[in-house]
């Protein structure tokens, strides 16, 4: 919640130190950047230790802030490096860390007092329940999902006392951030590890549309929406672009600084957007034009650009008979692009009229086609001159006292900070006594510093005829500037007190021994009645010795069937259980919650709450932080006696994450899809009652909640078409002539290699699931997983027909030919 409505934060990106300087000079209040480890832009320039310390100092000199991105998922072995990585930045005064991993969050919270933690957009915070959970955990700020409307953001602001940060400009992902495995599963480069290869920006085909960029949204520009965004309660306006140039960072930062200040000073009546400013932003970077993101629409087709995935620039004219009829002025050094993709660099500028092209420049371009400028050379030069070639300066006042026979004294002051330094005793001058002009000349030599002052800012007091060497004045000036810098910076600096903890990684605990699983259970997820009926029939057949799989639990998904459909399916299992005399053969039924739990879905579950309670589900499979807080708030957690399993997409990459979830009341976990066999084994053996001894990170705590004496339930998906994307965008809607809303079902994409990716449009929740082209298959690794300590393996049925379900149940998938091992063998980068 915003306490001071006259202040808002412009938060700019920096992939390099030059970008950082550009952001500060252009008016950013804060800069977010990545260090040498654990950032979500592993291919940005990023900052080494020296540069990052320098950035923190520079920002604090100017009264700005630095936020460090640690917004990736960390494995157990990487946690050991985390505290020592953060420590020097914390001690220098780092303002906040942006975090995705729940384990990382807990470690930073418990080891770095006073360090603000910001919940990354990778945590998929889509409403007030998730924001409330993160505040309870200790977050000072949440970065909302890009898909939220201004109204939904306002609902968070009005109900949770926490700062809100939202993206306002730059690239949009087609998938909810934190829910994407497309790059991970296709090429082994995980977005959750900062290495996304952006296969979403490649061509796909569906619904008769061939080879278009069906998963590529336009860039977002919300300059015109600033009044509504600020009124919704957004405190920090975040600009995307840690892979962008310094000119881009400076130009976009300046524009948002200008219009945020305009609205705060003049209100709606005085808020007027200059079309020229929007044009300059288009010149800097746009993908097929701009959109306003999701602030005003849930999944408007205008968000998408099917024709190109990269910078389009602006239209500057049209082709006619080998010439360009200019609609915009062009400059020397501008780069023009024609319809066939060819480029031409302008040798000399021209304001209007016809621009003749050398013979052969235009090859296949037809008359009447548009010519785009993809580089505005003059604009880039202007930005560089204003914001990159020179740094902003802090005003400084100086007062120097030069008295014959006494020590020289220099006092400097900048805002409310001051420093006083002394020199040697001044002797009487025989030939060249000090003059005011001479003194001012030396004191004004502030080049290479953060300060500036005019003659009027320097007070010179001379008593007698002292001899004042130039060296003395220079030494006084340097010492005073060093002291006032330290005075300014000292407020943010801290000292980390290291607790006296036993060091080590894993040490054998003879009391509990290695985690073991006596029986490997089998669970199944279904999406419709046909799949469920096939399972029931197969399980019945198993009683007669035909089935290879004994089902202990069924998860009922609601993406296609809705809540009522899941309740109806629950009654089918109840009927089956009534005819089972052996309690050990009875099947538990868990309700699988949606992947995304936005306010419209919250209202739906509120409406169906009594029906859900009456249905008598045995537990819940939850898939978002929103749902975890929701079930705590409405009594469902107590209703099910804490029988809650979190799904793979809530990411338990490490022991510390398991510990943190356990503190929040969760002891059932679906293991990550991005850990290989060795990493899974290490994680399984580090958690719960059967953890191998006490696990700590060097001298630091993994979290205050780990007692090594818990029963932890671990489940691993062993078969299924894995969702690679969860999207607010509806590609079926974007590519259909009619409106497909309300017609939930399965449709298919084809990628450039001819592989088909199934997708489900879940109209009840208004999101899409896009699945891998082949299923993951690990059912033959069941014994291996059991020996790791996994309690159950799960079969995830999604798009399978009834006969396919029966085949997999009866043969343990032995007949499956085309499949993937996921990351079980190779892991991710």
Which residues fall in each region the model found?
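Active-site pocket-lining/capping segments in soluble small-molecule metabolic enzymes
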Residues: 2-125, 143-236, 243-829
């Amino acid at each position: 919640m915003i306490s001071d409505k006259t202040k808002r934060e412009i938060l700019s990106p920096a992939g390099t130190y030059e970008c950082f300087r550009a952001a500060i000079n252009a008016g950013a209040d804060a800069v977010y950047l990545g260090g040498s480890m654990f950032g979500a832009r592993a291919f940005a320039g990023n900052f080494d230790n020296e540069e990052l310390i320098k950035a923190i100092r520079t920002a604090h000199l100017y009264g700005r802030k630095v936020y460090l991105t640690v917004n990736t998922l960390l494995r157990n072995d990487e946690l050991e490096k985390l505290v020592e990585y953060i420590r020097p930045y914390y001690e220098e005064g780092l303002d906040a860390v942006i975090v995705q991993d729940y384990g990382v969050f807990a470690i930073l919270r418990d080891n770095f007092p006073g360090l603000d933690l910001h919940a990354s957009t990778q945590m998929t915070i889509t409403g007030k329940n998730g924001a409330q959970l993160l505040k309870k955990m200790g977050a000072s700020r949440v970065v909302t999902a890009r898909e939220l409307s201004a109204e939904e953001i306002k609902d968070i602001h009005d109900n949770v006392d926490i700062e809100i940060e939202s993206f306002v400009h730059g690239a949009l992902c087609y998938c909810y951030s934190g829910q994407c495995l497309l790059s991970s599963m296709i090429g082994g480069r995980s977005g959750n590890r900062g290495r996304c290869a952006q296969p979403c920006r490649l061509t796909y085909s569906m619904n008769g549309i061939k080879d278009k960029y069906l998963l590529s949204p336009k860039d977002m520009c919300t300059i015109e929406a600033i009044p509504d965004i600020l009124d919704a309660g957004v405190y920090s306006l975040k600009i995307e672009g840690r892979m962008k140039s310094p000119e881009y960072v400076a130009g976009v930062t300046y524009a948002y600084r200008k219009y945020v200040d305009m609205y705060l000073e003049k209100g709606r009546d005085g808020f007027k957007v200059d079309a020229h400013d929007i044009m300059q932003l288009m010149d800097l970077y746009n993908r097929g034009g701009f959109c306003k993101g999701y602030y005003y629409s849930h999944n408007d087709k205008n968000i998408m650009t099917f024709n190109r995935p990269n910078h389009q620039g602006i239209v500057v004219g049209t082709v006619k008979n080998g010439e360009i009829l200019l609609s915009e002025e062009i400059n020397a050094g501008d780069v023009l692009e024609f319809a066939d993709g060819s480029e031409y660099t302008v040798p000399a500028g021209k304001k209007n009229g016809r621009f003749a092209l050398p013979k052969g420049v235009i090859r296949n371009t037809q008359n009447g086609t548009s010519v785009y400028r993809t580089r505005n050379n003059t604009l880039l030069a202007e930005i560089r001159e204003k914001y990159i070639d020179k740094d902003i300066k802090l005003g400084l006042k100086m007062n120097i006292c030069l008295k014959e026979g006494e020590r020289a004294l220099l006092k400097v002051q900048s805002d409310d900070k001051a420093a006083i330094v002394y020199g040697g005793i001044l002797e009487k001058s025989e030939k060249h006594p000090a003059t005011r002009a001479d003194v001012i000349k030396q004191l004004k030599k502030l080049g290479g510093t953060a300060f500036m002052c005019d003659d009027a800012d320097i007070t010179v007091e001379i008593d007698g005829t002292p001899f004042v060497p130039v060296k003395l004045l220079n030494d006084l000036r340097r010492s005073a500037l060093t002291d006032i810098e330290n005075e300014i910076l000292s407020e943010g600096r801290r000292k980390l007190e290291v607790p006296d903890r036993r060091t080590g990684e894993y040490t054998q605990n003879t009391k509990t021994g290695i985690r073991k699983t006596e029986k490997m259970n089998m669970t199944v997820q279904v999406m419709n009645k046909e799949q469920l009926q096939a399972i029931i029939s197969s399980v019945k057949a198993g009683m007669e010795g035909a089935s290879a799989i004994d089902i202990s639990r069924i998860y009922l998904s609601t993406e296609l069937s809705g809540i009522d459909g899941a309740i109806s399916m629950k009654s089918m299992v109840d009927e089956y259980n009534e005819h089972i005399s052996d309690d050990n053969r009875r099947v538990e039924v868990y309700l699988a919650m949606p992947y995304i739990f936005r306010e419209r879905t919250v209202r739906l579950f509120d409406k169906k709450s009594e029906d859900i309670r009456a249905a008598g589900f045995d537990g819940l499979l939850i898939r978002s932080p929103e749902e975890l807080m929701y079930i705590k708030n409405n009594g469902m957690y107590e209703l099910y006696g804490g029988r809650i399993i979190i799904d793979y997409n809530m990411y338990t990459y490490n022991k510390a994450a398991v510990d943190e979830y356990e503190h929040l009341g969760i002891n059932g976990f679906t293991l990550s899809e991005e850990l290989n066999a060795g990493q899974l084994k290490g994680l399984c053996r580090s958690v719960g009652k059967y953890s191998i001894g006490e696990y700590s990170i060097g001298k630091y705590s993994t979290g205050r909640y780990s007692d090594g004496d818990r029963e932890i339930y671990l489940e691993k998906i062993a078969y299924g078409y894995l969702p690679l994307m969860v999207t607010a965008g509806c590609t079926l809607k974007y590519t259909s002539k009619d409106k497909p809303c309300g017609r939930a079902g399965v449709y298919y994409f084809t990628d450039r290699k001819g592989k088909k990716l199934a997708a489900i449009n879940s109209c009840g929740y208004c999101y899409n699931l896009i699945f891998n082209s082949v299923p993951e298959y690990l059912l033959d690794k069941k014994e291996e997983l059991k020996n790791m300590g996994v309690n159950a393996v799960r079969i995830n049925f999604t798009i399978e027909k009834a006969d396919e379900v029966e085949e997999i149940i009866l043969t343990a998938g032995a007949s499956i030919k085309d499949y993937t091992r996921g990351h079980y063998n190779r892991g991710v980068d």
